[in-house]
Design a protein with these regions (language model features):
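Non-catalytic accessory segments flanking enzymatic or RNA/DNA-binding domains
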Residues: 1-168
């Protein structure tokens, strides 16, 4: 939704918004260092959530539980805590080798949720796969947060809409 000049200059569209492992604010490099101090150089969590299936994700500490609710998580568990966005992104990249970082939104909306997934067990499996250099960020004794959402029924079919083509 940004014009090109804004897209390449706004801190809101920095590469690290979608790819935290590319953040350079911790090295003093940013489109807007004041913005980065509030968004990138703050505590971040790496989390495991259950939407349709399990996924790994990153969010600022101030965005818990908002991020989980935005993504439609029915369960979520903090995995690691870091002092900045870059560190959280590096852990997420390691974990994406073993667990998705995407929400299967079609299955989620149809309520096809794999309730058999044990987030505590999954966390232990992921810790065992995590590079040693990231283990000091791992959190212990975290509780699983659970969420439920009001609904009348679930759709049988779900498809995306191109809002630019609606009513065209």
């Amino acid at each position: 939704g940004y014009c090109y000049p804004c897209f390449i200059q706004s801190p809101n569209t920095s590469e690290c918004i979608l790819r935290p492992e590319l953040c350079r604010a911790q090295e003093g490099e940013a489109r807007d260092m004041e913005w980065s101090k509030e968004h990138c150089l703050k505590a971040h969590y790496v989390y495991i959530s259950l939407t349709a299936g399990a996924k790994i994700g990153v969010t600022r500490a101030t965005q818990i539980p908002t991020r989980w609710i935005d993504q439609g998580a029915v369960k979520a568990l903090k995995f690691a805590k870091t002092s900045n966005r870059y560190e959280a992104g590096c852990i997420e990249v390691e974990m994406k080798k073993h667990i998705s970082d995407r929400t299967a939104w079609q299955r989620m909306l149809k309520n096809q949720i794999d309730e058999s997934i044990d987030l505590y067990k999954l966390k232990e499996q992921l810790i065992n796969l995590l590079d040693e250099r990231y283990r000091n960020f791992i959190l212990g004794n975290e509780i699983i947060e659970t969420f439920s959402y009001p609904h009348k029924s679930f759709p049988e079919k779900v498809k995306s809409l191109d809002l630019l083509k609606v009513n065209s």
